[in-house]
UniProtKB/Swiss-Prot annotation:
It comes from Gibberella moniliformis (strain M3125 / FGSC 7600). Its EC number is 3.1.1.1. This is Carboxylic ester hydrolase FVEG_12634. Induction: Expression is induced in response to 2-benzoxasolinone (BOA) exposure. Carboxylic ester hydrolase; part of the Fusarium detoxification of benzoxazolinone cluster 2 (FDB2) involved in the degradation of benzoxazolinones produced by the host plant. Maize, wheat, and rye produce the 2 benzoxazinone phytoanticipins 2,4-dihy-droxy-7-methoxy-1,4-benzoxazin-3-one (DIMBOA) and 2,4-dihydroxy-1,4-benzoxazin-3-one (DIBOA) that, due to their inherent instability once released, spontaneously degrade to the more stable corresponding benzoxazolinones, 6-methoxy-2-benzoxazolinone (MBOA) and 2-benzoxazolinone (BOA), respectively.
Length: 546
């Protein structure tokens, strides 16, 4: 597929940002897209700024001059992270990773500018990258119906992005800052940078979609929730959201829960728990980043996640969803949602830090992600008072994968959608549900065919072959033409002909390649599970800085 593409140097006058050197990717000899990689959107979060909210660039910050344009032809630096199926090369790993990549369609923009898709990468909030080859988005932006500027930010992950403790909270309080959720604050600052500067690249700052896959979809939800309840409407940025294969999650852990994780980390690093707050933080900030990564491997509380802080994450958020206020605010602001699933999400999920073959191992593994209260509810829901493997599961590994997939995707999506519909949003007009029961042939390049239509397999549907050597074949392009056009229209802000009319309706790509609308046969199970884990919150667990 890349044989038809070539790279050319591209010097661009970015107005008040200065002059920058990017790339023009040509297709069959004609300019297709312009690419700029690794543009900083915040000051480096290093040294004393490790484990603190991101800092804006100075107003007079310039990326380069006419005589010495800044070189942005590669990608972003990548946050240090534990090994995974896509472990980054050490040469691009750095805590100084608050940068973003931009793809701009070649040619003159529309009258009001290109629509903008701000796309957040996934990876459980622990791993991942916003980098992909500059050529990877040519098919989407030049050879499909989709025309928009793509902005892919890097943000802090794992311990660097989501460590929380009483010591950090005390320091943040004394500095007048928020604590925890640094990765979410990074994303927000990148979104604000985009809103403030994208017009310089030909973008329409009033037409921004936030999208993401997996943890990127969860992050997308967090960005929407934060904006609905913590940002005045006149300062709102988000026009619509696309959440691919994830949902709202459950009420995040409290500071007390997160403190247990921090204590475990300190012990693994050999830092005395009896030290003063200041001494603990000085010791933590003195640890080299590679040692902080190594210390995470094998932790019992392995997942560094969102903190229920009431600054970024409203403590009463689940109540606001359940009582219709979330839907009401979406309706008032005209925000629409695209959200759905792959049929076998669990096949991939059961391979992420898989627990051993026992009830207690699964229980402990879920505790790494969720609060003790939520974990207990989940295990009692499936296992009752017994500690035996429930009927219908081959082993504990499969059980974990299916339960994790229901929490991350299947069941909580349905509960969320139900609350939105009950709150006044309309199927096929405000909320666009979908389901994939087939995958592209090219996906076998990275994901075994026997894993089926599992998590991640639909990314090249939405991004039109991105990241895969062969991309879509001609038959697949015909089958998925309507999906591509629907996504393009959605991001453009126009009316989408999705085909769904009722809350239970899902647009579906079937095994035979055809598209239809089916009735959701897991709707009631999802509502029951949502009520179990996401109702009854009082929103009074206490602020993070208390």
């Amino acid at each position: 597929m890349f044989d038809n593409y070539s790279r050319e140097s591209y010097i661009f006058n970015a107005g008040s940002l200065g002059h920058i050197k990017g790339l023009t990717i040509t297709s069959h000899g004609s300019p297709a897209v312009h690419y700029f990689g690794g543009l900083p959107y915040a000051l480096p979060p290093v040294g004393q700024w490790r484990f603190r909210v991101p800092r804006r660039l100075p107003k007079d910050y310039r990326y380069g001059t006419a005589t010495e344009p800044g070189k942005f032809t590669d990608g972003t630096k990548i946050c240090p992270q534990p090994p995974s199926s896509n472990t980054p090369d050490p040469s691009v790993v750095s805590e100084d990773c608050l940068q973003l990549n931009i793809w701009v369609p070649a040619g003159p923009p529309p009258i009001h500018g290109w629509p903008v898709c701000f796309y957040i990468h996934g990876g459980f909030l622990q791993v991942g990258t916003s980098n992909t080859k500059p050529e990877d988005l040519v098919s989407l932006l030049n050879e499909s119906a989709f025309r928009a500027i793509m902005v892919l930010p890097s943000y802090r992950l794992n311990v660097f992005g989501f460590l929380a403790s009483k010591a950090l909270a005390a320091e943040a309080s004394s500095n007048g800052e928020a604590t925890g959720n640094y990765g979410l604050w990074d994303q927000r600052l990148a979104l604000e940078w985009t809103h403030e500067n994208i017009r310089l690249f030909g973008g329409d700052r009033s037409n921004i979609t936030v999208a993401g896959y997996s943890a990127g979809a969860y992050s997308t939800f967090q960005q929407l929730a934060h904006e609905l309840f913590r940002v005045p409407e006149e300062k709102a940025i988000i026009r619509r959201v696309a959440m691919f294969s994830n949902s709202t999650g459950v009420m995040p852990k409290s500071l007390q829960d997160q403190q247990l994780q921090c204590d475990e980390l300190l012990r693994r690093l050999g830092i005395n728990l009896d030290l003063s707050y200041d001494e603990k933080l000085a010791s933590l900030r003195a640890v080299p980043h590679d040692r902080l990564v190594q210390a995470q491997i094998g932790m019992r509380i392995s997942e560094f996640r969102v903190l229920a802080d009431d600054a970024f994450y409203p403590l009463d958020l689940m109540d606001k969803i359940n009582n219709g206020e979330f839907a009401k605010r979406m309706k008032i602001r005209g925000i629409r949602l695209m959200n759905g699933e792959c049929e076998s999400e669990h096949i991939m999920y059961c391979r992420w830090r898989t627990p051993q073959e026992s009830y207690s191992a699964v229980y402990q593994r879920l505790l790494a992600d969720f609060s003790p209260e939520v974990t207990q509810k989940i295990m009692e829901h499936y296992c009752g008072s017994s500690e035996n493997l429930p009927v219908g599961y081959k082993n504990w590994e499969e059980f974990f994968g299916r339960v994790y997939a229901n929490i991350q995707v299947h069941y909580l999506q349905r509960g969320f959608h139900n609350a939105l519909f009950t709150g006044g949003l309309e199927a096929g007009r405000d909320v666009f549900r979908y389901r994939f029961e087939r995958r592209l042939d090219c996906v076998a390049e990275k994901i075994p065919s026997e894993w089926g239509v599992t998590h991640l397999t639909d990314i090249p549907v939405w991004l039109w072959g991105c990241g895969y050597t062969n991309g879509l074949d001609d038959q697949e392009k015909k089958w998925l033409k309507g999906w591509n056009e629907g996504f393009a229209v959605f991001v453009n802000g126009d009316e989408v002909n999705w085909g769904t009319k009722n809350p239970k309706d899902m647009r579906r790509w079937r095994r035979d390649g055809k598209t239809d609308v089916c009735e959701d046969n897991s709707w009631e199970d999802g509502l029951k599970f949502w009520k179990l884990v996401n109702s009854g919150h009082r929103g009074t667990e206490g602020k993070a800085n208390d």
